[in-house]
Amino acid sequence: MNIARHFALAASAALLAFSAVAAENYSGPLKVGTTAAFAPPLETAVAEAKKQGLNVELVEFTDWTAPNVSVENGDIDVNLFQHKPFLENANQQGGFHLVPFAPAIINNIGLYSKKHTAIDQIPDGGTVAIANDPINGARGLLLLQKARLITLKPGAGLKSTVDDIVSNPKHLKIIEVEAVQLSRSLDEVDLAQGYPHYLRLSKTIDPNSALLFDGLEHPEYVIQFVIRDGHQNDPRLAKFVDIYQHSPVVRAKLDDFYGKLYQPGWSQ
């Protein structure tokens, strides 16, 4: 056998082996990780996918760390719970190789209170709860600045911390709480950053009753379907995302679950 033919056969064998592995990787059920805040519409999408011959398994997590670890390790194929700034920070902190695959929705977060009915009623020395992760905590601080309760250093932006506060005229005590627990903090604090979907699940307060909303014109905060880099060609994933984004049944569930406090991210 001449050398050229030997290498040609070797290359063909390698290609066949690679194709077999790729096919195996993209066979079986698509495993989707999420949290309680995004699960109900996904459950509807899973049911619709089954009708179309696509088997999808939904894995629900109770924190915001395990979903990324699970995608990185290959335990699940995709997760849905985070926006791009959170993902970028997670990649930097965890050494992950994760990328956004497609947009899902954006939620209208706000500042909530069970003790006061207007921002100007927040007392001097009052206690305010924001998220304790760097990115969503910054979002909370930006909301407080929008409410004119604090002023941040110019340019602090999406990575603001409490150290960036340059003016706090009401001497507010800002405490940092795990984001999924912010709704429960409302019994103890004067004001809290709130996520409508978690408020709805906890039944702590009407999600529509925020003293101030952030608004939906923030494309950076659109929640993303996130995968490990290199798996962009998974046909199961493309089909499932298409169902999530375009099925009338899923859209009806999104409307029912989030009400008017969300917007499809793929329309931005």
Please place each PLM-identified region on the residue numbering.
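Immediate post-signal peptide segment of exported/extracytoplasmic ligand-binding proteins
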Residues: A20-K31, A49-K51, I119-G125
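Short, polar/charged alpha-helical segment
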Residues: T35-E57
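Short helix-initiation/N-cap motifs at beta->coil->alpha
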Residues: V59-V69, A156-R184
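Beta->alpha turn/N-cap motifs
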Residues: E60-W64, N79-L87, I105, E178-A179, ...
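Ligand-binding "clamshell"
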Residues: N89-F101, K114-H116, E188, Q193, ...
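A conserved helix-loop-strand patch within extracytoplasmic ligand-binding domains
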Residues: F101-T151
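A bilobed periplasmic-binding-protein/Venus flytrap-type ligand-binding module shared by bacterial periplasmic
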Residues: N108-I119, Y221-R236
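Ligand-binding clefts/hinges and TM-proximal coupling segments of bilobed small-molecule sensing domains
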Residues: I135-K159, D242-Q268
